[in-house]
Amino acid sequence: MYRTHYSSEITEELNGQKVKVAGWVWEVKDLGGIKFLWIRDRDGIVQITAPKKKVDPELFKLIPKLRSEDVVAVEGVVNFTPKAKLGFEILPEKIVVLNRAETPLPLDPTGKVKAELDTRLDNRFMDLRRPEVMAIFKIRSSVFKAVRDFFHENGFIEIHTPKIIATATEGGTELFPMKYFEEDAFLAQSPQLYKQIMMASGLDRVYEIAPIFRAEEHNTTRHLNEAWSIDSEMAFIEDEEEVMSFLERLVAHAINYVREHNAKELDILNFELEEPKLPFPRVSYDKALEILGDLGKEIPWGEDIDTEGERLLGKYMMENENAPLYFLYQYPSEAKPFYIMKYDNKPEICRAFDLEYRGVEISSGGQREHRHDILVEQIKEKGLNPESFEFYLKAFRYGMPPHGGFGLGAERLIKQMLDLPNIREVILFPRDRRRLTP
């Protein structure tokens, strides 16, 4: 065993005890009669202090020969002292060089020499050695844990749906085609139809966390062609408000979990994550258009709110409501997919919503149309053929309860939570319009 403790696990209780630490060389300093070595692991930095009179001569000679990012393991005695930068040091008895790093490095993991995003993504393994990048992905891990725990605490069952499908989930054309033996198939852009089918099964409350694939040619700071979606569906709801209420509590739980468990990472990022206030404001589509009109942005009724409109609304909600998170709801039916339920007394309006975070849509959802005949008509209204959806419609003929749900973009949630400039910062190996490797 090369390691008994991570840097974060070395506490005063270990003072005077022997430990093993391992990681990458961060810095070496030679002061003649004393040499210093700092090594980095995933939790931080450890200082190795080697006074000439107290360490093996061969070990003393080895330290200045180490290069940045060499992989080493150190065995030694913990010494807590105010003289050490970090409050403690390790007096080495043994240093093993596990591997050498070539020079020059593809980028500087200390961050002193800046690198373009493309260079960083091409060398993601090295990029992650930067503490601020490591912090982002530790937070990402916490978000996924918090979300999964919250679903289970609220009686949801995890499901896994196909990612190779025969027909477009929402009738869109933004699908990646593929050959499935002798047939044409596509990569799934959403588990929408399958999670609705599950509402007829009696599972009642389901969720899935899985990749989705969208052949959108957008090359922006908020789009990916492969992303992770947090999807949910719940049966026996009376209206879309029940779904919105659950979603806001889920998002608030994830944010608060990060606040509680990732204080160190937030400090590394120099970011203060505010506690979300429940309930999130609800802004109707009509009210949103009115606000935008007052801001000089005119959107014809029935059209979706574009990127600039979202940005302006986000700024307005922060300045006037101090609300980074808010819902847009009561959308025109023509702007939303066929499976969204319309208001019976006002069919031009539907029971759909979007959740916005700092002016970017992170989730869409709503109450679904559970009545078979009406659903068939809505499919036709969108210019689609109901026969293509027979596998889906079949579930609606044998007792489908009222239901609703949402899809929440994991990367968008994390990007907006940390107020990062680019969605590629929060996914290890982005797939976008130009990037297929690494």
From Swiss-Prot:
- Recall the GO molecular function terms of this protein's record: aspartate-tRNA ligase activity; ATP binding; magnesium ion binding; RNA binding
> Among the record's GO biological process terms, what is one?
aspartyl-tRNA aminoacylation
Q: Where is this region: Aspartate?
A: 192-195
Q: How does activity depend on temperature?
A: Optimum temperature is 60 degrees Celsius.
Residues under site feature: Important for tRNA discrimination: W26, K85
- Pfam families from the UniProt entry: tRNA-synt_2, tRNA_anti-codon
Q: What Enzyme Commission number does this protein have?
A: 6.1.1.12
Q: Listed GO cellular component terms?
A: aminoacyl-tRNA synthetase multienzyme complex; cytosol
- How does the record describe its quaternary structure? Homodimer.
Identify this protein by name: Aspartate--tRNA(Asp) ligase
Native source organism of the sequence? Thermococcus kodakarensis (strain ATCC BAA-918 / JCM 12380 / KOD1)
